[in-house]
Regions:
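A short, conserved, highly charged catalytic patch centered on acidic carboxylates
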Residues: 1-122, 130, 138-140, 776
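Flexible phosphate/Mg2+-sensing switch loops adjacent to catalytic phosphate-binding sites
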Residues: 59-64, 245-249, 371-394, 416-450, ...
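Flexible, glycine/threonine-enriched loop-and-boundary segments that flank and lead into catalytic domains
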Residues: 379-397, 444, 490-520, 610-611, ...
Length: 948
């Protein structure tokens, strides 16, 4: 059972507002009269009223109840709400924990009486005051949820998107467009193969040719052909010409394999010729095609000669309904046909609409949609207010300065046109205009002329130009379906402005007009970190930031620099999808310092999540999305990803979002050459051998070396990251202070030191060649003379604590770890605390998503205040308890001790006790339970230590 018609979101929001007012009144009445609010007495009315908000008839509520067996007991019970393939709902009495309702719903789904074909993707639970909605994992109902949201009844009208599945939006709209787009891309692949064979394999994405001249001539010509054919296929099904299927009939009835190429070229010429300039003797079919104008058919192409297979591929494409495609999805796929891997990939490489909306939604779209919904849903809104808001939509400029095939621009335009259509319909209803307008062109004010894109690579830019026209026509049809016939768009007189060029070299102020409203800039510039940027790109960054030292700044920060320059005298906002490294390490003060100093704040942010690359063969990138404005309102929005491949979870923001994407003080942590805290010992690199492996003793060499009694005197345990983490044994020859006579007497020492000398002497580095004079010494030595703390360079993000160990001075630390003198255990205790790993996660750098330790950035800045003797002793004792707990299982490595799914209870208890002492020392007045609480203390302490 579904609703008879899809309700628009404004109506749903209005219905939900009335629903919450009515049910909040019920709850107040129950509480005032001390009446019990039990599920059995009120749940069916509650579900019925909720479903009614989405156009589902409450009289049919009995259809949604269902008997089912529970997996835990084997007994049969009654599901409160069940819509096969859509949702299962459970209600509990007022005040009851919703976990009980959620678990009961899952129990029914796992009971075996509900067939797989009817398993719903959603669970909804309520105790009348609170609701919980869960989108289940598609692979297994009992597995981790895709997303899970809990909110109060008072907030229900703010959660239209999470409840939209009840109105069938999810299945009836986007999925159909997505599947159509995938099928359309396969047809284009078939055409490309037919025209070029399957051996063509060219770079796509950031590495694609930037100009047609750089492209293989045949591939370039095919690319232009396919762009034009796409326009014609779309025109057939979307009503661009008066005669339906005009192009398909032309190909099928008036061409042969031999004549198709020249006839297509003739058609292209005609489409670019005004009606009055055409020959009067044109054949009838060709004469029916309208004048297109624009740049689509402007250039003359060399004829393409088709064969039977090529013509059949085109006819197959003609049989498809091209009006159904999501142009933003299709455009992303279309640009990839030149890649052999992408052609075989069955369409998995594209940026989803969901990911695009994560950027443009909180930047501007959600705000405009909310304003429109409130105006439309209120019967008291006069036509004048609706028209004023619609006029305002036409005052904004929208730009993607790294637009690719235009998917961000296409999605933004499509969604904004839907907002405008709702406003037009509402205005007409209030004026009493119930009939269809004879011409709606005068009613539409939002224009593709407000949309701008910059793109370095020529073919995506060409696709974007064409795709913007196609999505404009789709939007016109939606408007026409609501109020009248679509406006005439041929010949093309208004186009989106897609500029083919290097965005970082363009003067944006010359390309983008001054907007009467705001300029919104957004997109996902190239994912190039400091390690993958070229020297030319590094020079671009130096010029843009006006700094010789750009350190580790990612290439994407060039777009931030351009925005700061552009917005110096203009109003607007901007947001980019970027690699997550811009919010880590020393990039944070370098990037966010100038942004904040220019008066910007973070309007919204998505913390680290996996963004699938559009380019085939490229792994998912760990990204963040950060949006900026210069306003005071609204309150900033922040989303976290407990699972980087999962759904976002909203994080409440009380103050502001800082450069580390944390709700807290706007502090920027700078590298320090020595510890800020008087309690910390300097952490330094371990010892680097530079020996060609000849001073190291592997497990299979140990017995041989130890058999030499002289060499055996100098064998020491050797610890790098792997040995530290996994308890592996490795040794080295440590000959610092060795007796020269011993070296002369030992064949093993002589042989190995001779090999070291030869290795160093052959080095290209002068510093290494000089070390050949002292082959018995490690090339770089920093070994402490006391017990010390050993810290790995990288720790898994899954670890609950930073995995460190104390060693005695006779254990040699390799250059793959850091070490800090720790004679009394204080350094170990501080580094083992939740406070330290919180600091590391917050301000430290990362390797992909793993934590990367840096002495100058995370250790030297760790803001431990000066401790009194008693506090210091308590922390040291608590740290020793952690070591004692580890010692209960001496066979376990650090990796095994700190497996987040299998930490020993004794070890967890010891860490909890340590945390209480360290938290208290950092200034906590009560027990801390969240990362956020620790972050607030850490930033406050850092500000004190730096007088910030």
């Amino acid at each position: 059972m579904t609703s008879s018609a899809l309700l628009d979101r404004a109506t749903i929001r209005h219905n939900l507002t009335e629903f919450k007012v009515r049910w909040l009144a019920h709850i107040e009445e129950w509480k005032a009269e001390n009446r019990p609010a039990t599920e059995s007495s009120h749940d069916q009315q509650f579900w019925g009223d909720l479903l009614d908000c989405f156009g589902i008839n409450a009289r049919d509520i009995y259809l949604y109840q269902r008997s089912a067996k529970r997996a835990s007991t084997g007994r049969t019970g009654k599901i409160d709400l069940f819509m096969p393939g859509k949702v299962i709902g459970e209600a509990k009495s007022l005040g009851v924990n919703l976990d009980d309702a959620h678990n009961q719903a899952l129990d029914y789904l796992l009971g075996g009486t509900i067939p797989n074909s009817q398993l719903p993707p959603y669970v909804i639970c309520s105790n009348f005051e609170t609701l919980r909605i869960t989108r289940l994992n598609r692979d297994y109902v009992g597995d981790t949820a895709d997303w899970d949201v809990i909110f109060s009844l008072d907030e229900i009208d703010e959660h239209v998107e999470q409840l939209a599945f009840l109105a069938d939006y999810e299945t009836s709209e986007y999925r159909e467009e997505e599947q159509a787009s995938l099928e359309a891309s396969r047809l284009m692949v078939d055409l490309f193969r037919a025209m070029n064979g399957d051996d063509v394999d060219e770079a796509v994405g950031d590495e694609a040719p930037t100009t047609p001249e750089e492209e293989d001539e045949r591939v370039m010509r095919t690319s232009v052909y396919l762009t034009r054919i796409l326009f014609l296929l779309f025109g057939d099904d979307a009503g661009l010409w008066d005669t339906p299927h005009l192009f398909a009939d032309f190909v099928r009835n008036e061409t042969t394999p031999e004549s198709l190429g020249p006839q297509l070229n003739e058609l292209f010429r005609i489409l670019n010729t005004p009606i009055e300039k055409r020959s009067k003797r044109l054949p009838g079919t060709l004469a029916k095609f309208p004048y297109v104008n624009g740049a689509i058919f402007a250039d003359t192409l060399e004829p393409e000669y088709f064969d039977y297979a090529m013509r059949e591929a085109l006819l197959n494409a003609c049989d498809f309904d091209w009006s159904k495609i999501d142009v933003s999805v299709f455009g992303s796929l279309f640009q990839l046909v030149k890649s052999k891997e992408a052609r075989r990939g069955d369409g998995e490489h594209y940026t989803s609409k969901t990911n695009i909306l994560k950027t443009i939604g909180p930047l501007f779209l959600d705000e405009l949609r909310d304003q429109a919904d409130k105006l439309v849903s209120s019967p008291a809104t006069p036509v004048r207010k609706l028209e004023e808001f619609r006029d305002s939509l036409a005052t904004h400029i929208f730009c993607d300065p790294a637009c690719g095939a235009g998917n961000f621009l296409l999605t933004a335009y499509k969604e904004l046109r839907r907002i405008e259509t709702d406003l037009i319909v509402a205005s007409r209803q209030r004026r009493g205009e119930t009939g269809m307008s004879l011409n709606i062109e005068w009613e539409q004010k939002l224009s593709i002329g407000q949309f701008y894109g910059f793109e370095l690579n020529w073919w995506p830019a060409k696709i974007a130009e064409t795709a913007m026209f196609l999505v404009d026509h789709q939007a016109n049809k939606e408007l026409a379906n609501a109020v009248g016939r679509p406006p005439q768009r041929l010949p093309i007189t208004i186009t989106a402005h897609i500029v083919h060029g290097n965005a970082l070299a363009l003067d944006w102020t010359e390309v983008l007009p001054v907007a009467a409203g705001e300029t919104c800039i957004f997109g996902n510039p190239p994912f190039l970190g400091h390690a993958t940027r070229t020297e030319d790109q590094a020079n671009e960054l130096r010029e843009l930031w006006g700094a010789k030292d750009i350190s580790r700044l990612d290439y994407v920060t060039g777009w931030h620099a351009k925005c700061l320059d552009f917005f110096e005298n203009r109003s607007g906002r901007f947001a980019f999808v970027t690699t997550n490294s811009i919010t880590q390490g020393d990039q944070v003060p370098r990037l966010f310092g100038p942004i904040f100093n220019a008066g910007w704040r973070i309007r919204f942010a998505h913390r680290t999540f996996a963004w699938d690359s559009e380019a085939p063969g490229k792994a998912a990138v760990h990204c963040v999305i950060v949006g900026f404005d210069r306003a005071q309102d609204p309150r900033p929005k922040l989303w976290d990803y407990p699972n980087v491949k999962g759904e976002p979870v909203a994080v409440p923001v009380e103050r502001a979002i800082n450069g580390y994407l944390v709700d807290g003080a706007n502090v920027l942590v700078e590298k320090q050459k020595k510890p800020l805290s008087p309690e910390l010992s300097p952490a330094v690199f371990g010892n680097m051998a530079r020996d060609g492996g000849n001073l190291l003793v592997e497990a299979d060499q140990y017995e041989e070396v130890m058999s030499d009694p002289i060499a055996a005197k100098y064998v020491r345990p050797f610890r790098g990251s792997r040995e530290l983490m996994h308890g592996l044994e490795r040794w080295c020859l440590w000959l610092d202070g060795a007796n020269p006579g011993d070296i002369a007497k030992s064949p093993i020492l002589r042989q190995r030191l001779q090999a070291v000398a030869e290795f160093r002497a052959a080095s290209k580095a002068a510093s290494t060649r000089k070390m050949a004079d002292t082959p018995y010494l490690f090339g770089q030595r920093s070994q402490p003379q006391t017990d010390y703390l050993c810290l790995p360079k990288v720790v898994s993000e899954r670890r609950k604590y930073f995995t460190v160990q104390r060693y005695s001075a006779d254990v040699i630390a390799s250059d793959l770890v850091f070490h800090a003198q720790d004679p009394n255990g204080l350094q170990f205790a501080l580094a083992s605390s939740s406070m330290f790993i919180t600091w590391q996660k917050t301000v430290g750098g990362r390797l992909k998503s793993d934590l990367r330790f840096a002495n100058t950035l995370t250790w030297n800045t760790f803001p431990v205040p000066e401790l009194d003797e008693k506090t210091r002793e308590r922390i040291i004792k608590a740290g020793q308890k952690v070591l004692d707990a580890r010692a209960l299982h001496p066979d376990r490595s650090l990796a095994e001790h700190y497996n987040p799914l299998a930490m020993a209870p004794e070890l967890l208890k010891a860490h909890d006790a340590l945390d209480r002492e360290v938290d208290k020392a950092m200034g906590a007045a009560r027990k801390l339970t969240t990362e956020r609480q620790r972050q607030e203390l850490l930033f406050a302490n850092y500000a004190k230590l730096t007088n910030n």
